[in-house]
Regions:
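Beta-propeller-forming repeat regions
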Residues: 1-416
Length: 416
């Protein structure tokens, strides 16, 4: 029998300056090694100590050092300061948009502002040409993913009060992208919380999930039809939402934070009642430690991802605390440790499940985006974070240990 494997994480902080709420990675200089993009910078891998500008980093703030003295600090005011501010850079999505073989990056700005992509100039000593492609990207969890099933990702978001997606012109992706509305205009706004993609009803087509239900993708998208809405409450408005068969019964369930600025993480079990799709709520974590089987509690889950962290074939929940979402005041437990956790999914034969929480880190947290992927190419998913504490990579390590060592590292249930 093979020795059990212990999963640990090593934090590397690339910067303590606040430039963005979302960072990502790709090989930007084509040297075969992944680099990090965070705000106006990209950091050369594998060391990430040498950085280059995508665009001019002009933001600064004045930090008082006493009654008569201030110092100018680069970046937006975050953990290095005292007041709450916001960056102009919330999500980063690398992709080769113009097909020249060099990775570019799509940047979604502050909610309600424009989305642009920066064209890789193929040399590290130049700013990247900026292409504004969509004028107003609403929702606090927009994404860039293949919603339509055509093999090409779309910008999925809200604009002008409706859900939909924007597509580039393949012959000229620098031109303004085309908007395809999928919902009626219902007053959705730039600060609407909670959105995700997934095949809810198992018809092979990707649906759009939001806090009040899900929009069913029709068989044909010709003519931009309005999608069918199925009302189901999925919390008050979290962050990224996911459709996944949690308990292995063949039906996709929904995983979401209950609210991005307070407490709560849940999965909604899909079941059928006379052929009708219904959901049953299972709270994984909430405002009281007793509401988690292992006594874990933290707030501000403003980014939630679903990734197989331990290679067992089941997707696990990866999330954390968005440090100072609204600054020093406002959100509950706002000054608690900026933790990251992964919740290991364990399926039982009777279709019951457990999500075992493992702390990844206690001094980084998440932004509005959390990117989980194999940065150092060792076969294990790492975490990339940009937020008010700075820019981080949390490197995933795994080593065989004795049964006693493994058992000592396991979380202990405090309730049934």
């Amino acid at each position: 029998m093979a020795d059990p494997v212990l999963h640990t994480f090593k934090r590397q902080q690339l910067s303590d300056q606040f430039w963005c709420e979302g960072a990502s990675f790709a090989d930007f200089n084509r040297d075969g090694v992944n680099d990090i993009v965070s705000g106006p910078w990209w950091y050369e891998g594998p060391g990430f100590t040498h950085r280059h500008e995508l665009y001019a980093p002009t933001a600064t703030f004045a930090l008082p050092l006493g009654p008569m003295t201030t110092v100018t600090v680069p970046g937006f005011e975050g953990a290095l300061g005292n007041k709450n501010t916001y960056s102009d850079n919330f999500f980063a999505f690398p992709r080769d948009f113009n097909g020249d073989g060099w990775m570019d990056v799509l940047i979604v700005g502050f909610p309600g502002k424009e989305t642009v992509w920066f064209e890789n100039p193929k040399t590290p000593d130049r700013h990247w040409p900026r292409h504004e492609v969509f004028p107003q990207t609403d929702n606090e969890s927009p994404t860039f993913a293949d919603l339509t099933g055509d093999g090409t990702p779309e910008l999925v978001c809200i604009t002008e009060g409706a859900y939909g997606y924007a597509t580039p012109d393949p012959s000229d992706p620098a031109k303004p992208w085309t908007w395809h509305r999928i919902s009626p205009v219902k007053g959705y706004g730039n600060f609407t919380h909670g959105m995700g993609l997934g095949d809810v009803n198992g018809d092979g087509r990707t649906d759009l999930i939001e806090k009040d239900g899900w929009w069913e993708q029709p068989a044909s998208l010709a003519g931009d039809p309005v999608w069918t809405f199925h009302a189901t409450p999925f919390g008050l408005g979290g962050s990224q939402m996911h459709a996944y068969d949690v308990n292995g019964d063949g039906l996709n369930d929904v995983i979401t934070a209950l609210t991005a600025h307070a407490f709560g993480l849940a999965w909604y079990e899909q079941y059928r009642d006379g052929g009708e799709i219904k959901f049953r709520e299972h709270i994984l974590m909430n405002k009281e430690p007793s509401e988690n089987r292992y006594g874990v509690k933290f707030s501000e889950l403003h980014a939630v991802e679903l990734v197989d962290m331990d290679g067992d074939g089941l997707k696990d929940i990866v999330t954390g605390k968005r440090f100072w979402s609204h600054g020093r005041v406002g959100d509950p437990d706002r000054n608690q440790a900026a933790v990251n956790y992964w919740f290991r999914l364990v399926r039982e034969p009777d279709h019951s499940v457990d999500f075992i929480p493992y702390r990844i880190d206690d001094n980084s947290g998440v932004g509005t985006q959390l990117v989980v992927g194999d940065v150092d190419r060792n076969g294990l998913p790492d975490l990339v974070v940009g937020n008010k504490k700075g820019t981080f990579v949390l490197f995933h390590e795994a080593k065989p240990v004795s049964q006693a060592e493994w058992q000592k590292a396991q979380p202990t249930p405090v309730s049934k």
